[in-house]
Amino acid sequence: MTNLRKVHPLFKIINTSFVDLPAPASLSSWWNFGSLLGVCLAVQILTGLFLAMHYTSDTATAFNSVTHICRDVNYGWMIRYAHANGASMFFICLYMHVGRGLYYGSYTYSETWNIGILLLFATMATAFMGYVLPWGQMSFWGATVITNLLSAVPYIGTELVQWIWGGFSVDKATLTRFFAFHFLLPFIISALVMVHLLFLHETGSNNPTGIPSDPDKIPFHPYYTIKXILGLLFLLTALSTLVLFSPDLLGDPDNYTPANPLNTPPHIKPEWYFLFAYAILRSIPNKLGGVLALILSILILAIIPLLHTSKQRSMTFRPLSQCLFWLLVANLMALTWIGGQPVEHPFIVIGQTASVLYFSTILILMPLAALAENKLLKW
């Protein structure tokens, strides 16, 4: 008798995606982050659902409702901190996943890559709106500063900002709509994940060598399910350590002060995972220029397939490109650090230098290095 998982209409889909899926035999741990992102999304949706049961999206009660969750709800503090730190884990996995794609040339699967960029934007939007919900000082002022960036749009900027605010400042209407969208977007992300996987399974996975692996495939289960479980254990260990021992490590102390429109915090900054983009935004003195640089710092990923000049797909056998890749990683870390510093000398100059280096590495240096490698390897 044929196995049920191979004939049942629903189980068949799961079977071809996670059980009998032919996978390259040489996948390294860098291929773990896709499954870890799935786990992160599930954790965020579950913890978020329980938080939404107790949260009220009203300016008068939002801050107090979060306090109530932490003090009075059974394990509410744990759910809240799992959600907040789960977002940090989500972005760590996201950046690792994107970095893996850049290093091993996975961006040549253009549909999968473009859906991935959409997913990145959707996740960033969700995280930004989630940061506003506790209605602390940094929530309020972060929302004010970031939404105000839209006023740089020529001609319709001011109207656009007021339309998003639902008034003349960040207020009750803004908080209510941000809560609605923060609740809705993860489900849209889940749907996009399905499309992401659909396109990936059209081509099959890339592998560390960048060479087609059709002659050498192994079943996904048990080889990669056990590998994914090991990665999951590492993720859950890191997350629970953060939640149970140092839940506020990555947060901002200002967010424990209720939002006050009359009192501006000395340093307004977003969560750590947006600091690199925030540093690029602040590096440009012109408002519209800064906003464009901010958007392009992420959107630049979309043109990376067009900038691929190497005859090889992966960077595994390309030492020059490897050096530039790790320079880019170090540069992003420097930008993250600068984004958290005040706008004063020498941080301004460091931020501007790192921003120029970020764009020039991707747009000029990496394509040139790839061409040089083609010559060196006589390809």
From Swiss-Prot:
Keywords assigned by UniProt, alphabetized: Electron transport, Heme, Iron, Membrane, Metal-binding, Mitochondrion, Mitochondrion inner membrane, Respiratory chain, Transmembrane, Transmembrane helix, Transport, Ubiquinone
Electron transport in keyword set: yes
Quaternary state and interactors: The cytochrome bc1 complex contains 11 subunits: 3 respiratory subunits (MT-CYB, CYC1 and UQCRFS1), 2 core proteins (UQCRC1 and UQCRC2) and 6 low-molecular weight proteins (UQCRH/QCR6, UQCRB/QCR7, UQCRQ/QCR8, UQCR10/QCR9, UQCR11/QCR10 and a cleavage product of UQCRFS1). This cytochrome bc1 complex then forms a dimer.
UniProt xrefs under PANTHER family: CYTOCHROME B
Chain's role: Component of the ubiquinol-cytochrome c reductase complex (complex III or cytochrome b-c1 complex) that is part of the mitochondrial respiratory chain. The b-c1 complex mediates electron transfer from ubiquinol to cytochrome c. Contributes to the generation of a proton gradient across the mitochondrial membrane that is then used for ATP synthesis.
Further remarks about this protein from its record: Heme 1 (or BL or b562) is low-potential and absorbs at about 562 nm, and heme 2 (or BH or b566) is high-potential and absorbs at about 566 nm.
Protein name per Swiss-Prot or TrEMBL: Cytochrome b
Taxonomy of the source species: Eukaryota, Metazoa, Chordata, Craniata, Vertebrata
Gene, per the UniProt record: MT-CYB
